[in-house]
Regions:
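Conserved beta-strand scaffold positions in the cores of enzyme catalytic domains, especially
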Residues: 10, 176, 235, 392-394, ...
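A domain-start/cap signature at the N-terminus of enzymes
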Residues: 375-412
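Short amphipathic alpha-helix adjacent to the substrate-entry channel of hydrolases
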Residues: 425-441
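Alpha/beta-hydrolase active-site loop
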Residues: 449-456
Length: 456
């Protein structure tokens, strides 16, 4: 089956407002139960939810200056956040990081009522990432957060996991487990959770930028959860020569049954992966600038995990890396001139594929890119035959003869070469392209002299 891909279409949820905070987090869920995905981000001294699919309705569900009166001085927007059904009532609540860690209870009428603000932990400081996982395997989700500041907290340069209390609405503190106790220096950023060593227990990886203001950074590492539940966990360094290290997520990218890591340098250049179990560092893309976000998912529907990221600057590129399932990645462009501090893969339009949701950071916007519709063409119309041993279809389009020859196995990205005249005059070139997985298409439009009709 041949898959034809169009361009990714950019949809704007929120254009951004100068001087009202920078959206650094993007999450989505169907909060009002109407069958359409809604979106949420943080700016303008609070958290705002947008109703899909047309985004014409929005509501600031919590205003920080009204909701919190403690010791911490909150900023105008969260640095990160995630979703979890904290109170077990069947809807997704928002967990945010803004000089402390908090959660917002989703009410019965999420676009009409305020979301109740409750503190999770105001002792840890510098939680650049919040992510959920069942850390202790009790069947309930926990929260993983970093306490990355070197001072101003009893838990400097650390990473913790937090257990939800039996009654989360009571104000009871969440149980804090400091598993990386002072051995996560520098500017620790984002965590990835997964069983790396195959012992059945989730482990946690993290990346940290370095430099003069963040001594001890420039590393990627993972912490091994011990079987006896003791603290702290054992640290395993993946690499300490990674300027701008930020994001890291675990998965098996080469099909050998061993966990690997995909990582980006959000305060530097490039994306790479670490091949398990030795964790050899393999460069994927050395040129992408400030890829300060990362998500994994099967973007092309071929059964293996791909990666997506976006640069943080105004001129950032949104890209995805197509995986062949054997450890090779091919960079594909999604969009340009879009910044990001957070990126999620979500089916935003209900068409059963993963779209890309982006919190715009310096662009101050919240946008999503629609995954191009995959049009199955099987078979092409017309007469079937063989050309040089390859399947060919001949048909007419606008009274012009057309031919399409399929490779035996399509190359990543399913590339095509088009011939506008003189079918078969360079058979050796066409054979070489087919052997490399390219489709060869022919349509005689030479008499249209490159006009728009010829392109069509």
């Amino acid at each position: 089956m041949t898959q034809v891909w169009a361009e990714w279409k950019k949809e704007v949820i929120h254009k951004g407002i100068e001087g009202r905070g920078i959206p650094n987090v993007a999450v989505a869920a169907d909060w009002d139960g109407d069958g359409a995905m809604d979106a949420m981000t943080s700016f303008d001294n609070g958290v705002t939810v947008f109703r899909g699919p047309d985004w014409k309705t929005s509501r600031q569900v919590t205003r920080f200056s009204d909701a919190y009166h403690g010791e911490r001085k909150l900023r105008t927007s969260c640095i990160h956040g995630c979703l979890m059904d904290v109170d077990g009532d069947g809807d997704l609540d928002f967990l945010g990081s803004n000089q402390l860690v908090f959660w917002l209870e989703c009410p019965d009428r999420p676009f009409e009522q305020d979301w109740t603000f409750r503190v999770i932990d105001e002792q840890i400081l510098g939680s650049h990432c919040l992510t959920v996982a069942d850390v202790d395997l009790d069947g309930k989700l926990d929260l993983v957060a970093n306490s990355g500041r070197p001072e101003g907290t009893p838990y400097p340069n650390s990473i913790v996991w937090l257990k939800v209390p039996s009654d989360p609405k009571s104000g009871t503190p969440w149980q804090r487990k400091v598993f990386a106790d002072g051995d996560a220096p520098g500017g620790s950023h984002y965590m990835g959770v997964g069983d790396v060593n195959g012992d059945g227990l989730p482990d946690v990886a993290c990346g940290a930028k370095g430099g003069e203001k963040f001594p001890g950074g420039e590393w990627f590492a993972w912490w091994e959860q011990p079987k006896d539940g003791s603290l702290p966990w054992k640290k395993h360094l993946l690499s300490d020569r990674q300027p701008g290290a930020s994001n890291i997520l675990p998965a098996d990218f080469d099909g050998d049954g061993k966990i690997d890591y995909f990582a980006t340098r959000g305060h530097g250049l490039g994306a790479l992966w670490f091949r398990g179990p030795s964790f050899e560092a393999i460069e994927v893309d050395s040129t992408i600038v400030n890829p300060h976000s990362l998500a994994l998912g099967d973007l092309d529907g071929d059964g293996d995990l791909d990666a997506a990221t976006c640069g943080s600057q105004l001129t950032g590129k949104v890209v995805w890396y197509e995986s062949d399932g054997q450890g090779k990645f091919h960079r594909r462009l999604i969009g340009e001139n879009q910044g990001s501090y957070d990126l999620r893969l979500v089916d935003m339009d209900g068409d059963s594929d993963l779209d890309v949701l982006v919190a715009g950071h310096f662009n101050r916007n919240l946008v999503w890119y629609a995954n191009p519709a995959k049009k199955a063409i099987m078979p092409f119309p017309g007469k079937a035959s063989l050309w040089q041993g390859y399947e060919m279809r001949e048909f007419s389009l606008d009274q012009r003869t057309c031919r399409v020859v399929r490779p035996k196995q399509a190359a990543p990205g399913r590339p095509w070469v088009w011939r506008a005249r003189f079918w078969g005059h360079e058979p050796q070139t066409d054979r070489a392209m087919l052997e490399r997985g390219w489709h060869v298409a022919y349509c005689d439009v030479a008499n249209l002299f490159g006009s728009p009709d010829a392109v069509r």
